[in-house]
Amino acid sequence: MMVQRLGLISPPASQVSTACNQISPSLQRAMNAANLNIPPSDTRSLISRESLASTTLSLTESQSASSMKQEWSQGYRALPSLSNHGSQNGLDLGDLLSLPPGTSMSSNSVSNSLPSYLFGTESSHSPYPSPRHSSTRSHSARSKKRALSLSPLSDGIGIDFNTIIRTSPTSLVAYINGSRASPANLSPQPEVYGHFLGVRGSCIPQPRPVPGSQKGVLVAPGGLALPAYGEDGALEHERMQQLEHGGLQPGLVNHMVVQHGLPGPDSQSAGLFKTERLEEFPGSTVDLPPAPPLPPLPPPPGPPPPYHAHAHLHHPELGPHAQQLALPQATLDDDGEMDGIGGKHCCRWIDCSALYDQQEELVRHIEKVHIDQRKGEDFTCFWAGCPRRYKPFNARYKLLIHMRVHSGEKPNKCTFEGCEKAFSRLENLKIHLRSHTGEKPYLCQHPGCQKAFSNSSDRAKHQRTHLDTKPYACQIPGCTKRYTDPSSLRKHVKAHSSKEQQARKKLRSSTELHPDLLTDCLTVQSLQPATSPRDAAAEGTVGRSPGPGPDLYSAPIFSSNYSSRSGTAAGAVPPPHPVSHPSPGHNVQGSPHNPSSQLPPLTAVDAGAERFAPSAPSPHHISPRRVPAPSSILQRTQPPYTQQPSGSHLKSYQPETNSSFQPNGIHVHGFYGQLQKFCPPHYPDSQRIVPPVSSCSVVPSFEDCLVPTSMGQASFDVFHRAFSTHSGITVYDLPSSSSSLFGESLRSGAEDATFLQISTVDRCPSQLSSVYTEG
């Protein structure tokens, strides 16, 4: 049997120790009883050959090796081959030791699914079992079950790549540092991937080939000495121990990177395999001297340089003055000329960053080094940020004068006493001297204009006003101002900005809400009482309440199947006399729920009782009234009531869905509250005449009407008016024939019940949409 091994990437010694610890129980049982086979429970925990094949394939693809040569490290022991009379689930001791350490073994693996070249079989008479021979043992019931894969990473570290793969590369280092797993950890992680061998970084020790004389030997617990896997087993083991016990340095964590596919430091070719026969090695274990101490790791690289210092990395010949590139640029004064920077004068010519203490030294440096060294007629300024954009001059002196702007040299000083101004150009000094002498040699050339100026530029600006050519227009929307010179336009734009700031301040101060304003919006104002129906009919007002009525919408009882509809509110009844103008309620009288044939016009319910039905109210002014209850309500059976704690025997009532109630019912849609309360009166039917109530009458407070006392007709009317005024509740008067309205006899068989329905909505004026009524 032939075994493959990588020449470059060698797993750490943790895999060897893991494999030895897993094999050792089987080896001990095999040594105690030579003819006993390893039970399936022990071999099931080992890695299958299929895992080894997949790992080898992935490594072969990543290394792209063309030449292959296989060999075993020194000290491997060749034992007799596998017995032909072994059982299906058993392996001999020789078969166990003939495999390299770290090779996965399992009797449940599907060996016949692997190609023969993975096992290195070169001839049919090989003494080692081929996949064909071993395929006879792969037909057990558990043959399709693949064992867990173990890799150099999964043995010693136990990394959960499902969690780390979605994070940054540096998270892998923090995870390894925090896990503190032992290299000899025996519990394989179910989520570990055995093919993750291509990641190399400072967190994973990089293998380095060592001479064959320095290969260490690991001793299994059973007493058998197994050689270290790979060429760098001892070094990898020591490095992993340093990584686990010492932890990572802060600098390493900050500059940690994961490198993919980089060759080793001493490797000459990547991924070359070597093949040799296993029987050529000696059959005894060789004890080798220990490996030399681990060389010190190189210091981690420093942080990347700042952006402005990149030029120093490419120009190491520059002196220590190159470290001053981060200094800010020099500022320009009012005359457009440059001042010095903190006592230092920096040369910003291309590929130069010299610093000088004196300005004269910088001027001499520019002239001798940068200008005089130019050959031919090329007089171009290469100063960084020069607005000329490498436009050349036609003379040397012009370039020298121009360089004064960059160097800050001002040789032309004012000669007047007390004036300390200096200029880089002589022309500017002459113009400045005219301000002292009052000389204005530049006269306006427009006929009839006698203005004179000290410089030609000011005269040119003035002459544009005569020609009415104002090319500089204000670009602010709504502004039509135009100017002859850009300086005037700049001043105008500044004035615009100051005006906008003032307008913003005023707007900010005006938008702030005054506390009194907010208090007025949140205060519940008292409601004004509405006039009686008699007053409304006498005044001839149809469909609206006289005077400024409160914005309370009374909601009479409606069936539950109407509560889900929204949009319109059914009015009470048609008006007592024909209405000349159509109301919103008349537009929907022909609806299927409110047919017009079932709503006869009513002028008065009872002529002797002086009770009037209210006309169709206006959508915006609906006042609480006393209206008669529909006759269909009197024929309904009501559920038991609950006693209210108010003291006036208020009873709650839950309406039921009844088809007989729909035509004459008064329906209000779009409201939230649907609480109905009923109050049985305590006065005889003869006293039910409602006296006319004036709109100016004083209404007592609602709290005064809740005292639990025996009430007569007058007190109950007062209660009705107070209750309707303060809460917007419609009061229904029931006839005397409804003595058993609620399924029970009330206090007196001749007494009727007046029920109250509380489902009103108080709203802010002009904030709710109109509520339309149905006739």
UniProtKB/Swiss-Prot annotation:
Compositional bias annotation for Pro residues: 289-307
Disease: Diabetes mellitus, neonatal, with congenital hypothyroidism: A syndrome of neonatal diabetes syndrome associated with congenital hypothyroidism, congenital glaucoma, hepatic fibrosis and polycystic kidneys.
One GO biological process term: regulation of transcription by RNA polymerase II
Distribution of this protein across tissues and organs: In the adult, expressed at high levels in the kidney and at lower levels in the brain, skeletal muscle, pancreas, liver, lung, thymus and ovary.
Polar residues biased stretches: 557-567, 588-600, 632-663
Keywords: Activator, Congenital hypothyroidism, Diabetes mellitus, DNA-binding, Metal-binding, Nucleus, Repeat, Repressor, Transcription, Transcription regulation, Zinc, Zinc-finger
Sequence similarity: Belongs to the GLI C2H2-type zinc-finger protein family.
Protein's cellular compartments: Nucleus
Zinc finger (C2H2-type): 345-370, 379-406, 412-436, 442-466, 472-496
Keyword Transcription: yes
Amino acid composition bias (Basic residues), ranges on this chain: 134-147
Function: Acts both as a repressor and an activator of transcription. Binds to the consensus sequence 5'-GACCACCCAC-3'.
One GO MF term: zinc ion binding
Motif range (Bipartite nuclear localization signal): 491-507
Principal location class: nucleus
Region (Disordered): 121-147, 282-314, 485-512, 529-665
Name of the protein in question: Zinc finger protein GLIS3
Compositionally biased spans, kind Low complexity: 123-133
Xref: InterPro entries: GLI-like (IPR043359), Znf-C2H2_ZIC1-5/GLI1-3-like (IPR056436), Znf_C2H2_sf (IPR036236), Znf_C2H2_type (IPR013087)
SUPFAM superfamilies per UniProt: beta-beta-alpha zinc fingers
GO CC terms of this entry: nucleus
Protein source organism: Homo sapiens (Human)
Biased composition regions of type Basic and acidic residues, renumbered to the chain: 497-512
Gene3D superfamilies: Classic Zinc Finger (3.30.160.60)
